[in-house]
Each structure stands twice: as C-alpha cells, then as structure tokens.
Regions:
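Catalytic core of the metallo-beta-lactamase
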Residues: 1-55, 76, 123-179
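Active-site HxH/HxHxD metal-binding segment of metal-dependent hydrolases
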Residues: 40-41, 45-144
Length: 179
C-alpha cells in the first residue's frame, strides 16, 4: 500500500515492505522520481508509469538487503542512477553481498516466534544479485533535484556505508541508524 503526502511541489510516497517491515520513500516531480531504500512494488511502478516517469534516482541509506531489494526491479523498468556511500557500494559489488545471512536469520527467528512463514514467502520473491553503484561518495554528497537540495552524509555505525539523507534541511531519512 502506498501512502501519499505532499511537500510543496513534490508528491511524497511511503511504502512498507511487507516481508521485512522496511520503509521505502519516493519523491515524485514531473518525469523524475527519487526512491530511497527501494523494494519491489508493482503498485508504485504502475503509478510511476502513469505519471510518465522516465528517470529514477535511487538513494540508499545503507547497503543491507532489506533496503536494497528492489533495485533490480526499478532498473528493469526505468533509467536509473544508484547513489550510495563508497563502503556500501563496494560491499554491494562483492561476492559477500550474495549471502544475506542476517536478514534470513531474522526472518527465520520471527517465523518461529510468530508461527508465520515470512522467510519462505520472502525467498520466493527476493532476487539476489550484486550491484554496481553509479555515484559514490566518501563523506558527503550534495545534489539538486527538482528545486530541492538533497544531502547525503556518511554516518558509519549500523553498517560501514550508513548515511543520512537530508532534504532541504527539513526531512531526514536515517535508514536503520539512530540519531
């Protein structure tokens, strides 16, 4: 399910990935969209096609699979640019990335506790692949998008590539990092 909000001239969309309760955020303006921490969503893809979106910028708060699992999906449907902190990008392009042990462990433990089958369902839809990131940064990156300033700041802790994404000095996306 997509939740819509409006931030001035930008359509702001939030979606929770049903398998792992991970948030994806989308900023939509004209024929461009910014997706933060993507997961596969046919509903979002249909909306982006309906809005004639041609280009998608993918920003990652960090490199863990619950925040990157939809990259391939949007690459298949749109012209994409992936932006990630350098350490996260290096990990996503390594063979180690092909072993999502922590995520599968957590889902398995939740299944035991809750009597659910989320891990089994997740494995049916999860596509495991390495990614080459288009734009990396060491400590900070600023970019202008649709009259808005996007700032990415490296804050290692949760992962080596963890970053804050700040929009117009007003909105902060932390991924799994705590402030």
């Amino acid at each position: 399910m997509l939740n819509h909000y409006f931030l001035g001239d930008v359509d702001f969309i939030q979606s929770v990935y049903e398998y792992v309760n991970s948030n994806m955020y989308v900023l939509l303006s004209g024929e461009e969209a910014v997706i933060i921490d993507p997961h596969k969503s046919q509903e979002l893809t249909d909306l982006l096609v309906e809005k004639n979106v041609r280009k998608v910028i993918i920003l990652l708060t960090h490199e863990h699979h619950d925040h990157t699992s939809g990259i391939y999906w949007y690459q298949e449907h749109f012209a994409t640019t992936i932006i990630c902190q350098k350490n996260g990008a290096e990990y996503m392009d390594s063979k180690k990335y092909l072993r999502p042990m922590i995520l599968t462990f957590i889902l398995g433990e939740e299944d035991k506790i809750n009597g659910t089958h989320k891990l089994e369902e997740f494995k049916k839809v999860f596509v495991l692949r390495q990614y080459s990131v288009d734009v990396t940064y060491e400590e900070e990156l600023s970019l202008k998008w649709s009259n808005h300033m996007l700032e990415l700041t490296h804050i290692p802790g949760h992962s080596k590539g963890s970053s804050l994404i700040i929009i117009d000095d007003s909105f902060v996306f932390t991924g799994d990092s705590l402030l």
